[in-house]
Design a protein with these regions (language model features):
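Predominantly a Rossmann-like dinucleotide-binding segment in NAD(P)-dependent oxidoreductases
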Residues: 133-211, 325
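Beta-loop-alpha module in the N-terminal Rossmann-like domain of NAD(P)-dependent dehydrogenases
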Residues: 26, 57-119
Length: 333
């Protein structure tokens, strides 16, 4: 089947595939904040909850995602499922001519990420990966202040959360991995977004604090192509507290921020200068709006398929490092 034209007119007609914890955030913003989207229908595995949500949002409940994708009135879909399902759903969506907003991680491994990329190319539709931290107000403000730091020396990123209530996250057959894949991809993408450089080598360690099948705690050291910058990345889903720490150090000073607690400081010598920030930005709203704007204006997505593929490539290199106990190269396709 040939993909539909990439030029769209507002309101765009959307379907939601997966309306659980993450998918519900998309549904809420579409219903309350995005008049440029007309929600046609949704599907989730829990039929009772799916029907209730369809009534709540004034749309149709589809009994299978294939039925939703077969609806010719739908222009685009948001896919927010356990990532082991992404390949089959994206292949069918592309075949049906639907543009795709895909929740991260794009895939559970490089093989499946490349397969999705090939599918999108074959059918002429468009896909954007939901790397929402690029739209965080703290991240945007920090990125704008990096050039005055001069040559960069090091970066440190840390994301920590409480144990997840989602049972499927600790089922490897559905999740494909633990915090390296599901949260690490945010940090891996931010390294590239903040520096404009590609990660070259990684050395990674993992363990399990609460989980049984997957890791919920990791630390990694990363180096970059054509640069002496050293980065450390950490993540945990086993503590009773949250953070989203970002530290960037350059020749002329440092930036220290937290995208969870909404603060940013410039550091020169012993002086910490707080940077005034607005209220926290709802990143799901911002990225959905950007997805719609890009479709309607026929301009590139701010997060590309390649961005999604590369985040998975870095995660895969981390997993190889945990197995070999050595530095591993990031394999770029």
């Amino acid at each position: 089947m040939l993909g539909r034209s990439t030029i769209m007119e507002s309101p765009l007609r959307f379907g939601l595939i997966g309306v659980g914890r993450h998918g519900s955030r998309y549904a809420k913003h579409i219903h309350e904040d995005l008049p440029q989207i007309d929600l046609i229908g949704l599907w989730r595995r829990n039929t009772g909850e799916g029907k209730r949500q369809a009534r709540q949002y004034g749309c149709r409940y589809f009994h299978t995602y294939s039925d939703l994708l077969a609806d010719k009135s739908i222009d685009a879909v948001v896919v927010a499922l356990p990532p082991a399902l992404n390949v089959s759903v994206c292949e069918e969506a592309a075949f049906r001519g639907k543009h795709i907003h895909l929740e991260k991680p794009m895939a559970i491994n490089m093989r499946e990420a490349i397969r999705i990329r090939q599918t999108i190319s074959r059918y002429g539709v468009r896909l954007m990966v939901s790397q929402t931290l690029r739209f965080n107000g703290v991240v945007i403000a920090l990125r704008a202040r990096i050039p005055p730091l001069g040559p960069l020396h090091s970066l440190h990123l840390s994301q920590r959360f409480e144990p997840s209530p989602l049972a499927w996250l600790d089922r490897r057959d559905l999740s494909g991995g633990g915090i390296v894949l599901h949260t690490g991809v945010h940090s891996f993408d931010l390294l590239r977004f903040l520096t404009g450089m590609e990660v070259d080598k990684v050395s990674c360690w993992v363990n399990s604090v609460v989980t049984k099948e997957t890791e919920d705690n990791f630390s990694a050291i990363m180096t970059f192509e054509k640069s002496d910058i050293i980065a450390t990345v950490m993540g945990s889903r086993g503590t009773k507290g949250r953070n989203g720490l970002i530290e960037v150090a350059g020749e002329n000073g440092q930036l220290i921020a937290d995208h969870v607690h909404n603060y940013l400081h410039e550091v020169r010598g012993m002086e910490w200068k707080p940077i005034e920030l607005g209220n926290p930005v709802p990143t799901v709203y911002e990225i959905l709006k950007a997805f719609c704007d890009s479709l309607c204006r026929e301009v590139p997505f701010p997060v590309t398929i390649e961005d999604g593929v590369i985040a998975v490539a870095i995660a895969e290199a981390c997993y190889r490092s945990t197995e070999t106990g050595t530095w591993e190269n990031v394999s770029y396709p």
